[in-house]
Amino acid sequence: MSLFRLDLKVINQTEQRTRFSMTLSNHSSRTLEEWTLYFSITRFLDASSNTQGELSQLGSFCTLQSLATLQAGAQFATEFEMPTPPLQLQCDGILEAFIVASEQYSVDVTPLQLIEPKSNPQPIAKVHKASVGIIPKPQEIHIDSGVFEFAHNEAIFVGCDQAKQAALWLIEAKPELGLSLGKEANKIEFKRLESLPHQSYQLEVTSNSITLFANDYQGFSHGVASLLQLLGNGTKATCVQISDSPVYDYRGMMLDCSRHFHQLDQIKLIIDQLARYKYNHFHWHLTDDEGWRIEIKAFPELTDIGAWRGKDLPLTAQFKHIDSKYGGFYSQEQIKEVIAYAKCRGISVIPEIDIPGHCRAAIKALPHLLLDRDDKSIYRSVQHYTDNVLSPALEGTYEFLDRVLEEVAELFPAPYVHIGADEVPEGVWTDSEKCQAVMTEYGYSDAKELQGHLLRYVENKLSSLGKRMLGWEEAQYGDKVSQQTVIYSWQSEEAAIKCARKGFDVVLQPGQYTYLDMAQEFDATESGFYWANITPLKHAYHYRPLSEIEASDPIQQKVWGIQAGLWCELIDSAERLQYMVHPRLQAIAEVAWTKETNKDWNDFLSRLQLDLEGLEGRGIHYRNPF
């Protein structure tokens, strides 16, 4: 317990403004003569409304300098406002704090005191636990009597090259079975069936044998995923006959590793879970304002400087761990390791290099290339930065993009690179002589066209490297990129439909249903955001993609699939990550895989009970909805 405590209390709120009192208590025997309070909060503070001391904010990192002495046993109090609607969750408050005087002191932060804390949890139906708990639900499954019991040292006969990596995954996932690859037909056989469609599989488990049929490596991986769920934490598989295939070809999850850095073992654990629930794409968000996480050999500064943040570092402390140097990055060798690990489980790894906004880490690392020192434009990003956008008018920007994209394209075998392109703030580039000159040269009338100008260059560069460009829905702003760009819609499904009508292929990732950083319940103590929605498990499960679009509408063919996403401003530990992921990841898996006519909420809950036992047996944290 610290000798200093910080309390934040809502004292007044309207539809668009909230006023707070903040109290710092000194429970020590020390008197602080000259001191500064540092704290982090994800909301934007109106510094001009502060009543005591001098308040400033950069991103989530706030500095309060006081001229008043803080006596031992005394308190310091101030008030300030946020231009925000009424707050609903305690995590809207201060995340962490510390004081610097003659030395640095830790500060205990109490939960935000809300005016009217709300608690309105959605009840979960009481259902019996299923005997077979496969998620997502197969299109056809017949459960027979009896079980197949694995004897130690069983061999798997692999009848085709496409099945080998799935067999190796099974061996690795269940080491207690002592499995190995066999050279001749036996009790466990993986066979190719060329008549099966892409990603499909058939699994037959009898008391004497296990036979898995598929036509490609992803189909075999999906079949192994079902077999692993049949086994659970044991050595027996219920006898079943399964014929299965996905509704959507693309089923992905995006993980933000910039806001907080996730260790390599956690990346692999996420990939394991994706494979078990038959996802086939891992979208790796590797760069953002708060950290550059991928080694680029052409620019070692990106990780020497851009991967680390702290109070006195070029990249300012943000969110959690603000009292010390924090960060990390993945070497190219580690990334190759992740790619191979994912491939063995039927998953393709898609890198994201977020441009032209969300680039503060890159700009701070490479100011000699990326900083336009004569740009007087005034803007503020959604995350409260005023210096996080690349300039389309600097030669250094294109040198940076060329070298980074060349290394990324060589490193990742997937045919796609995601370039972000979201949340470029209003006002950017408007007071830059260099940018205005580019607009004049090309006949642009709106500064927003400069985003399209830059992204068209990136699209052409990626095409020359054999890659197709992916981007958030803002990638088509400025009307410069071609319809070869694939759009990921995050603000709403309607945005995806509009892009598809324009001729773009799209991936559905509406924050209202698929964002795993949204709070999971109507309870003030829950962690998460809610700008898109409070997203309980039931709400995620009942997402019906394109439900208002006729099945015969050509737009249906423009939709590749569905993706879940986890932004990590509030997620700084393995336990919190897993808590936010499970069990909504399972619900979204069923949305993406299973036909709507085969889905049933109570049946899902019945299977989920068995699935959660499997998570617990593997030591994986989750939020228990029951």
Q: What would you call each of these model-derived segments?
A:
Residues N12, T23-S29:
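Asparagine-centered strand-capping/turn motif at beta-strand->loop junctions
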Residues M22, G73, I156, D216, ...:
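Conserved, mostly hydrophobic/aromatic
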Residues S29-L58:
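Short acidic, flexible loop segments centered on an aromatic residue
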Residues N50-L87, L462:
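Intrinsically disordered, low-complexity Pro/Gly/Ser/Thr-rich segments with frequent PxxP/GP/PP motifs
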Residues Q71-E79, P86-I242, P246, M469-Q476, ...:
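Acidic, contiguous N-terminal accessory segments
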Residues L196-N388, P392-Y398, E407-Y416, Y457, ...:
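Feature activates predominantly on carbohydrate-active enzymes
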Residues A362-H368, Y379-T485, W490-K498:
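Active-site neighborhood of glycoside hydrolase catalytic domains
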Residues R468-T485, S489-F626:
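Flexible, acidic glycine-rich loops studded with aromatic residues
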